[in-house]
Amino acid sequence: MSTMTDRYAVIGNPIAHSKSPDIHARFAAQTQQDMRYEPLLAPLDGFLATVQDFVRNGGKGVNVTVPFKLEAYALATTLTERARAAGAVNTLKFDGADMLGDNTDGFGLVSDIVRNAKVEIANKSVLLLGAGGAARGVLLPLLHEQPARLVLANRTHSKALDLAHRFAAQPRLKVSTFADLDDSFDIVINATAASLASEVPPISPRVFTAHTLAYDMMYGAQPTAFMRFAAQHGATVRDGLGMLVEQAAESFYLWRGVRPETAAVFAELRAQL
């Protein structure tokens, strides 16, 4: 390996499970970029020191995962519009003293739905379940697609309302509790953590029809509980593996100026699950 090889990393805690090094190694080989990408475990109180050490040693950029996305947001000297809207950063690009903070999660979600699943968001009714960090991270890119309406639903109305207020200039954005959902939707996106516990958000099956795409931002070897529930009520289902690959491709493009092809990488990762 030449000393000129550019260094990138993903920082998190835990980090051993991350698929990002595998994804970016495939992107680099495909696009013939001279770079390496490694997982970095940061102590829970050591994110800043880990980043500073990485930059000192020639690091060009990092992806940031749980639990450091808010710290990355605070650390960035410049923020993209979508990072400001998300209130969190999953991608940092280093250029001298400048640290550009971006958030590619929403881009990844929209790309997977529109390009890969071939489902348009424009002029559709969209239901986004959850009002935490995952939901906030994708709201602006979803709204940019110009849905006919986007309903933000959460167990507690006040938390959904607080998040919606950050996007007050968006007349398409409505708020609901899970219990009050009664309409059907073209696209239903699960941004809650319920799937981690093999649970389903407490929503009426009436939100699904035979024409609904039910999308879980989680992924695994088997369909999630949310996907099984949606499929039982007629929906087409999709998990978040494609979102993971597409958000990685956007980070790669931000760093390298080259957009990798994602289809083969997605297929290889799916086969490994």
From Swiss-Prot:
Q: What UniProt keywords are attached to this protein's entry?
A: Amino-acid biosynthesis, Aromatic amino acid biosynthesis, NADP, Oxidoreductase
Residue numbers binding shikimate:
S18, K19, S20, T65, N90, D105, Y219
Question: Any one Gene Ontology biological process term?
Answer: chorismate biosynthetic process
Enumerate the catalysed reactions: shikimate + NADP(+) = 3-dehydroshikimate + NADPH + H(+)
One CC-aspect GO term: cytosol
Where does the record place the catalytic residues? K69
Q: What class of enzyme is it?
A: oxidoreductase
What CDD domains does the annotation carry? Answer: NAD_bind_Shikimate_DH
Q: Which residues are involved in binding NADP(+)?
A: E81, G130, A131, G132, G133, A134, N154, R155, T156, H157, S158, K159, M217, G240
Alphabetized InterPro entries for the sequence: Aminoacid_DH-like_N_sf, NAD(P)-bd_dom_sf, SDH_C, Shikimate_DH, Shikimate_DH-bd_N, Shikimate_DH_fam, Shikm_DH/Glu-tRNA_Rdtase
E.C. numbers: 1.1.1.25
What pathway does the annotation place this protein in? Metabolic intermediate biosynthesis; chorismate biosynthesis; chorismate from D-erythrose 4-phosphate and phosphoenolpyruvate: step 4/7
A molecular function annotated in GO for this UniProt entry is: NADP binding
Q: What PANTHER family does the annotation carry?
A: BIFUNCTIONAL 3-DEHYDROQUINATE DEHYDRATASE_SHIKIMATE DEHYDROGENASE, CHLOROPLASTIC, SHIKIMATE DEHYDROGENASE
**Function description:** Involved in the biosynthesis of the chorismate, which leads to the biosynthesis of aromatic amino acids. Catalyzes the reversible NADPH linked reduction of 3-dehydroshikimate (DHSA) to yield shikimate (SA).
Q: Which family does it belong to?
A: Belongs to the shikimate dehydrogenase family.
Assembly description: Homodimer.
Name assigned to this protein: Shikimate dehydrogenase (NADP(+))
Q: Which taxonomic lineage is given here?
A: Bacteria, Pseudomonadati, Pseudomonadota, Betaproteobacteria, Burkholderiales
